[in-house]
Amino acid sequence: MREYTQFYINGQWVDPVTPKTLEVLDPSTEEACATISLGSEADVDLAVAAAKAAFQSFSQTSVEERVGMLERMAEIFQRRIGEIAEAIRLEMGAPIKLASTAQAYAGLGHITEAAKILKGYTFTEDLGPHRVVKEPIGVCGLITPWNWPLNQVSCKVAPALAVGCTMVLKPSEIAPLSAYLYAEIMDEAGVPAGVFNLVNGDGPTVGEALSRHPDVDMMSFTGSTRAGSLVAQNAAPTVKRVTQELGGKSPNIILADADLEAAVTRGVMHMYNNTGQSCNAPSRMLVPRDLLSQAEAIAAKVTEGVVIGPTAEDSTTMGPVVSKIQWDKIQALIEGGIAEGAKVICGGPGLPEGIDRGYYVRPTVFSDVSNGMSIAEQEIFGPVLVMIPYDSEEEAIQIANDTPYGLAGYVQSGDLDHARQVASRIRAGNVHINGASPGMDVPFGGYKQSGNGREWGAHGFTDYLEIKAISGFEAA
């Protein structure tokens, strides 16, 4: 069993101030795969002090120096990609094929993208006698989730490092293993002591201590809307910047002119990706009422092709959800959907056939769902798709936007101009037409209760920068 009982503070692996350990469970077996330490406010104080001290010099480093660090990180990351994938598989239950591709390479992609952007990034702008300067904001508190563990670490750390910030990272205590490897990569890449610090722990202790800390200049949080609200409340007394990427209940509008089989197949497969544990999952499929029965049959056929099994096997396409807490929540929502009268097309409560351990969920499709049902309103965060019939395009757009969330939207149409028109009316930060993937060079973030601020690409630099105007910079 792996042991990660130290924290990375000021360039050193150090013991926690007060020893307290937690077992990390492999969700596919329910057995412990690692032991970590849980930090305290005292550990946070040490990490923040190191980051604050390092900021004085690191904020003055050249673009070339920071590009070099990022490029060295990318080189080491690539060399260790197999270890990283295995850590992700163990900590959150991703099938090894997914862990080795989308999960691991997302973390690498944000590093290489940040290096590329930094080479051409403009930190100054002259306006007559005035100069506008973009400067690093300072010490950043970074709190990341378990569902895309290294993707979320990297899309915060890489831009913060690129612009000259220092930071303290609290990864999810449920899935912390890959973050430790990330710290090792930064250390080997020669990132100066104190620039990056890692303290593990839970939200009410380490997360709250970071959010409240007077020497932390900004907080970047990814997770549930409930937890994100608490981070903002804890940060409010010190008036620090807070950026958040939170929950979602994303609509997938199948327009009448779409290739129905391709659109439904794509939508179901996307919903099941990462076992439905993605904040931007297309969890509400909106289908023309007269095409609903055909769409149901297609969805059932796609679901039959899902391969549930051991996460170490290449043939497995769906792993477990991350924890017993998540499994119980998903089961309650599935049972609630049945009680509310939704039609079960496939799946349902309980473990999949042939599975007797692990937090596996039967991939489930509901139909005849109304947008007011709990399964249409709440973020289930599991492999559960709801199909909602509509009678007109206007009604579809109204249903799509009738949610407190606004992270993503999806539009399927055989006419690109038609799809563009509908996409422009969806209140969401990211809209995907006909299955288009998001690019790491475009902003990622949400409207409404899905958060604020943007990550990824050049827009991802903005949250880590302060804007200064210097008047009289040039003689009048």
Language-model features, listed with the residues they occupy:
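Conserved C-terminal structural/oligomerization subdomain of aldehyde/semialdehyde dehydrogenase
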Residues: 29-35, 216, 253, 307, ...
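Rossmann-like NAD(P) dinucleotide-binding subdomain of oxidoreductase/dehydrogenase enzymes
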Residues: 78, 123-262, 390
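ALDH superfamily catalytic-core signature
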Residues: 226-370, 433
